[in-house]
From Swiss-Prot:
Organism: Saccharomyces cerevisiae (strain ATCC 204508 / S288c) (Baker's yeast)
Organismal lineage: Eukaryota, Fungi, Dikarya, Ascomycota, Saccharomycotina
Gene encoding the protein: PRP28
Descriptive protein name: Pre-mRNA-splicing ATP-dependent RNA helicase PRP28
An individual GO BP term: mRNA splicing, via spliceosome
Residue ranges of the motif Q motif: 172-202
Result for mutant: R499K: No growth at 15 degrees Celsius
Membership in a protein family: Belongs to the DEAD box helicase family. DDX23/PRP28 subfamily.
């Protein structure tokens, strides 16, 4: 067995490979300990050697050239002008050796800090990561790309809440689902200039016009939300799917659509808006659609004459419609669509029996082949409305608009205290002077309306008109015309007229006498703050009000404050002891 190699021979072989001196290659030197001065001297010598001898990595960096970089001529040109030409070719550092030995003189790194990089720094959108994770917004997607989450966001955006089994998704725009005929589409977008549907229109039209199954519909939405067009468009769509009828057949079968509304003013407003659409649509489609209204104030002879050539759409108040049916002025065999507009107001005005009577008559007189569709619209959902819906509607779709706070009308509510009518008028004069017309003042009694109009005539320069139930139909229409054409600045009206008014841009609503019910209060102040405009509602409270109503009013004013500007007078709080109990509940 061979003897193992000596350690000295192994070390000598390693040193030989490294090119060390042969005299020391075979010797093992004993470690020698250095003092502090010797160690410092050795470190300085080592640093000088490293600085004078470029490493392999440094040499590689010198040879690398910058390629395919962005064009920085604009930024570099500016920086070059600021440099001192005499120093551009000089060394960056001054050492004891020659400049030719400076290894950094030609150093041009491929990566450097540039002005353009500094400008672009931080320009990445903050929500870039969120967008890449969550995906595109529903407005950026096509219809087939929409998923359940997108439809849910769309409903949240427009404050649409639905229930009632399978409910169709809302319209994203007028054209996409091809529900509306092209000729009617041109009327809506080009002639009437409605670029996009309102929330109530978005959810009503696809659910009412679903050809697979005509379902009943109950919509809860505030006034001024576009409800009229929401039911007029489906009526016209359904009519366009059948051939036009001659006048003789219209007389024999009666109207195709029946629209009930609580007041004369609202009936006439619906007729006017519907005729605005049908007049243009008739020219586009050659479909002669006749719209007739039946309201109180017109004699039976006048109604009989207007119905002599039949009609396609009938708009009526419940009482006058029953009179016409009992006098055999019309028949209702072919009513395909029945609309109850402002259903809660009809109930408030005592029309519940008349409404149910009409619904029964329509069902009894209808031909067996007619599949009637019932649409109901209301601003508030009450037990009576629910009872009617349960009794006369078949598995309806329920849709509520404006549940979210952000969709509330932009109304500032101000509640002031006044001892009597004289005190109210004294406080009212400077208020109305601050607002542009039109202005609506609501009162509870006709005598107050006449007294208030006389006060304005004597003590101000403002022109006023009066609207209440004692006026004849011609007087009411004349008053509304004066108000709509800005010939008078203020209209004094009772609750009866509150629902039927459709006056745009009302800047101020005054409750000179607070209403007896909260529903009426809500409908009154709803005359302003419409179509995303801001409005103001001022209410005067005296010492003779119902305490429960004032407590309810206080809660409503505190809860519905979209502008964060509501004012509830301390005098009213102290008089009716409201606000204190709520504070105690919060504290304890």
């Amino acid at each position: 067995m061979a003897r193992p190699i000596d350690v000295s021979q192994l070390i000598a072989g390693i040193n030989k490979k490294k090119g060390l001196d042969e005299n020391t290659s075979g010797k093992i030197s004993k470690p020698r300990f250095l003092n502090k001065q010797e160690r410092s001297k050795q470190e300085r010598l080592k640093e000088n050697e490293e600085s004078l001898t470029p490493t392999q990595s440094d040499s590689a960096k010198v040879e690398i050239k910058k390629v395919n970089s962005r064009d920085d001529s604009f930024f570099n040109e500016t920086n070059d002008k600021k440099r001192n030409p005499s120093k551009q070719n000089g060394s960056k550092f001054h050492f004891s050796w020659n400049e030719s030995e400076d290894t950094l003189s030609g150093y041009d790194p491929i990566v450097s800090t540039r002005a353009i990089d500094l400008l672009w720094k931080g320009k990445t959108p903050k929500n870039a990561a969120e967008s890449s994770y969550m995906g595109k917004h529903w407005t950026e997607k096509s219809l087939h790309e929409m998923n359940e989450r997108d439809w849910r966001i769309l409903k949240e955006d427009y404050a649409i809440v639905t229930k009632g089994g399978t409910v169709e998704n809302p319209l994203r725009n007028w054209e996409e689902l091809n529900i509306i005929p092209r000729d009617l589409l041109r009327v809506i977008i080009q002639e009437l200039r409605f670029p996009s549907p309102t929330p109530i229109q978005r959810i009503t039209i696809p659910n009412v016009c679903n050809m697979k199954q005509y379902r009943d519909f109950l919509g809860v939405a505030s006034t001024g939300s576009g409800k009229t067009l929401a039911f007029v468009i489906p009526i016209l769509i359904k009519m366009s799917r059948s051939p036009p009828r001659p006048p003789s057949l219209k007389i024999i079968d009666g109207p195709k659509a029946l629209i009930l509304a609580p007041t004369r003013e609202l009936v006439q407003q619906i007729q006017k808006e519907t005729q605005k659409v049908t007049k243009i649509w008739s020219k586009e489609s050659n479909y002669d659609c006749k719209v007739i209204s039946i309201v109180g104030g017109h004699s039976l002879e006048e109604i009989s004459f207007s119905l002599s050539e039949g009609c396609d759409i009938l708009v009526a108040t419940p009482g006058r419609l029953i009179d016409s049916l009992e006098n055999h002025l019309l028949v209702m065999k072919q009513v395909e669509t029945l609309v109850l507009d402002e259903a809660d107001k009809m109930i408030d005005l005592g029309f519940e029996d008349q409404v149910t009577n009409i619904l029964t008559k329509v069902d009894i007189n209808a031909d067996s082949a007619v599949n009637r569709q019932t649409l109901m619209f209301t601003a508030t959902m009450t037990p009576v409305i629910e009872k009617i819906a349960a009794g006369y509607m078949q598995k309806p779709v329920y849709a509520t608009i404006g549940v979210e706070t952000g969709s509330e009308p932009l109304i500032q509510q101000v509640v002031e205290y006044a001892d009597n009518d004289e005190d109210k008028f004294k406080k009212l004069k400077p208020i109305v002077a601050k607002y542009d017309p039109p202005i609506i003042i609501f009162i509870n009694y006709k005598q107050t309306a006449d007294w208030l109009a006389e006060k304005f005539q004597k003590e101000t320069n403002m022109k006023v008109t009066i609207l209440h139930g004692s006026k004849s139909q011609e007087q009411r229409e004349h008053s509304l015309q004066l108000f709509r054409t800005n010939k008078v600045q203020i209209m004094i009206a009772t609750n009866v007229a509150a629902r039927g008014l459709d006056i745009p841009n009302v800047s101020l609503v005054v409750n000179f006498q607070i209403s007896k019910k909260m529903d009426d209060y809500i409908h009154r102040i709803g005359r302003t703050g419409r179509a995303a405009n801001e409005g103001t509602a001022v209410s005067f409270v005296s010492a003779a009000e119902d305490e429960s109503l004032i407590r309810e009013l206080y809660k409503y004013v505190r809860k519905h404050d979209p502008l964060n500007s509501n004012i509830f007078s301390e005098a009213v709080k102290n008089k009716y002891n409201v606000g204190k109990q709520l504070s105690n509940e919060i504290i304890y």
